[in-house]
Curated annotation (Swiss-Prot):
Keywords (A to Z) from UniProt: ATP-binding, Chaperone, Cytoplasm, Nucleotide-binding, Stress response
Lineage: Bacteria, Pseudomonadati, Pseudomonadota, Gammaproteobacteria, Enterobacterales
Record protein name field: Chaperone protein HtpG
Entry's transmembrane regions: none
PANTHER family in UniProt: HEAT SHOCK PROTEIN 90 FAMILY MEMBER
Species of provenance: Yersinia pestis
One Gene Ontology MF term: ATP binding
Stored InterPro entries: HATPase_C_sf, Heat_shock_protein_90_CS, HSP90_C, Hsp90_fam, Hsp90_N, Ribosomal_Su5_D2-typ_SF
Record family assignment: Belongs to the heat shock protein 90 family.
Length: 622
């Protein structure tokens, strides 16, 4: 062997190998699924590249993966005649993990083995799963179309390093030999291998063949042991739920069953087949900016690309699956997809299909839908801003916490809310805050509790942004309870003659507060919306809200200053006390204290908390 060298694994690979061997052992047979899946991908890539360069087939266009075993040497070998790898590709693919966020992800995994296996499965272990059952793995590979003497040898015991060298390999493709650990003899058994392949790889289009030796004359033949027909090309009636689930695990590299799926063949103006899955759990890097998503794209059953994100809007980036189009050209590129009318029509149809799946799930199985919402609700909340044409459908799928349930769980639909609206109630009331606890205890809710009116409690960072696009539902406008609004005044019975008289008596007090605060507030007024709180701050309907200003700040953007309306409760003892103070210095202390209290309740912070504490201490000891 030429060019031999020993190289160290990237630290993340070492971590992954250690975690995987320990946490996936109870489900160890998946190594076969992962390795056959990789061989299937290699075959897909070769077919695609050969569309423009048929010479890559090297006279052998019958693609397959073969399994053989040697009981004496205790080895299991998988060999494919797919795309193969160059030396640089071997180093990149087998020595490093090129996923951003990998280090943080691996560090976050603890010692809970059941949880770890799910997380690592979610991560996609691929080739490294071989080390679950092998104490040494040998790889021999050559890239399609490259000279025989550019083959590559790779070997490792799955510890700190690996050996790589140049070899001569006549056949293109990749051969992986697993030197099995003690106690793994079950994978040297013909029946056991057939059983695992039938379970995990029956649905893939690549033929999987097993070596059959004639006991009498020692001749070797190869027997195909899977159906080797692309699952999505079969009729729905022929496919079992278990086959659909197994195919999901193959394309998503996930260990868990999907929540739901939809398999459709469409004929007419456009002809295509789609198989779409809703996963049961979010991928570990779903919120990573570099997160890859999208569908597998096939054209006339020929694999074209992974992660074709043009067919699904970003807020549905969690959807896995594939589309097989008869209308797109075989030489389609990502750039062509971007501008294609066919792509836009497919995207629209597939988006509607996913939303229908979610509607059906919500209607038929509320518990499963709640599981979906916990995993992907935050992504779906991006929908009203991103997809105006489906806004009403998305709105029906949203779930919220509410004063009706007295729980932080987001289980209330807008249809639920509307069905419980009080007689004469014209608006859907909501509040946004930093946390569920802050929303639930906000003084803005006092009037609504008194009147028995339900309020939606929104505390996810995205909520304020979402509500700026979600303006109404079934003809009912949304109204933030922290905004000044005439409908809130009506609720508070502001026209009551006794209240008007009390307000008149306090007019000099209100003017005095206005003079003191000046430009720091937009207005000072009395309110009857409060029962237990002396004062609140609100914003005008056309003003930026507190939560939106926080969003701007979190994004590093300069937000316009929020000008609050300072509203005082004339029936509260502290306001009455402040109104009686004649000394200007003490009066200023009272007003500043009431304003700080209102700002603290609204924003959760003060610009000068120490001043607030000093002022409170002075008034308490006065």
């Amino acid at each position: 062997m030429k060019g031999q060298e020993t190289r160290g694994f990237q630290s993340e690979v070492k971590q992954l190998l250690h975690l995987m061997i320990h946490s996936l052992y109870s489900n160890k047979e998946i190594f076969l699924r992962e390795l056959i899946s990789n061989a299937s991908d290699a075959a897909d890539k070769l077919r695609f590249r050969a569309l423009s360069n048929p010479e890559l087939f090297e006279g052998d266009g019958e693609l397959r993966v073969r399994l053989s075993f040697d009981k004496e040497k205790r080895t299991l070998t998988l060999s494919d005649n797919g795309i193969g790898m160059t030396r640089d590709e071997v180093i990149d693919n087998l020595g490093t993990i090129a996923k951003s966020g990998t280090k943080a992800f691996l560090e976050s995994i603890g010692s809970d083995q059941a949880k770890d296996s799910q997380l690592i499965g979610q991560f996609g272990v691929g080739f490294y799963s071989a080390f679950i059952v092998a104490d040494k793995v040998t790889v021999r590979t050559r890239a399609a179309g490259a000279p025989a003497d550019t083959g590559v040898f790779w070997e490792s015991a799955g510890e700190g390093d690996y050996t790589i060298a140049d070899i001569t390999k006549d056949e293109r493709g990749t051969e992986i030999t697993l030197h099995l650990r003690e106690g793994e003899d079950e994978y040297l058994d013909d029946w056991r291998l057939r059983s695992v392949i039938s379970k995990y790889s029956d649905h893939i289009a690549l033929p999987v063949e097993i070596q059959v030796k004639n006991e009498e004359d020692g001749t070797v033949t190869w027997e195909k042991i899977n159906k080797a027909q692309a699952l999505w090309t079969r009729g729905k009636a022929e496919i079992s739920d278990d086959e659909y689930k197994a195919f999901y695990k193959h394309i998503a590299h996930d260990f868990t069953d999907p929540l739901s799926w939809s398999h459709n063949r469409v004929e007419g103006k456009q002809e295509y087949t789609s198989l779409l899955y809703i996963p049961a759990q979010a991928p570990w890097d779903m919120w990573n900016r570099d997160h890859k998503h999208g569908l597998k794209l096939y054209v006339q059953r020929v694999f074209i690309m992974d992660e074709a994100e043009q067919f699904m809007p970003n807020y549905l980036r969690f959807v896995r699956g594939l589309i097989d189009s008869n209308d797109l050209p075989l030489n389609v590129s990502r750039e062509i997809l971007q501008d294609s009318r066919i792509t836009q029509n497919l995207r629209s149809a597939l988006t509607k299909r996913v939303l229908q799946m979610l509607e059906k799930l919500a209607k038929d199985d509320a518990e499963k839908y709640q599981q979906f919402w916990q995993q992907f609700g935050m992504a779906l909340k991006e929908g009203p801003a991103e997809d105006g044409s489906n806004k009403e459908t998305i709105a029906k799928l949203l779930r919220f916490a509410s004063t009706h349930t007295d729980s932080s769980a987001q289980t209330v639909s807008l249809e639920d809310y509307v069905s419980r609206m009080a007689e004469g109630q014209e608006k859907i009331y909501y509040i946004t805050a930093d946390s569920y606890a802050a929303a639930k205890s906000s003084p803005h809710l006092e009037l609504f509790r008194k009147k028995g009116i339900e309020v939606l409690l929104l505390s996810d960072r995205i909520d304020e942004w979402m509500m700026s696009y979600l303006t109404e539902f079934e003809g009912k406008a949304f109204q933030s309870v922290s905004k000044a609004d005439d409908s809130l005044n009506k609720l508070a019975d502001e026209e009551n003659p006794e209240q008007q008289e009390a307000e008149k008596a306090l007019e000099p007090f209100v003017e005095r507060v206005k003079t003191l605060l000046g430009e720091r507030v937009k207005d000072v007024r009395l309110t009857h919306r409060l029962t237990d709180t002396p004062a609140i701050v609100t914003t005008d309907a056309d003003e930026m809200s507190t939560q939106m200003a926080k969003l701007f700040a979190a994004a590093g953007q300069q937000a316009p200053e929020v000008k609050y309306i300072f509203e005082l409760n004339p029936d509260h003892g502290l306001v009455k006390r402040a109104a009686e103070v004649t000394d200007d210095t003490q009066f200023a202390q009272w007003v500043e204290l009431l304003l700080d209290q209102a700002l603290l309740a609204e924003r959760g912070t003060l610009e000068d908390p120490n001043q607030f504490i000093r002022r409170m201490n002075q008034l308490l000891t006065a």
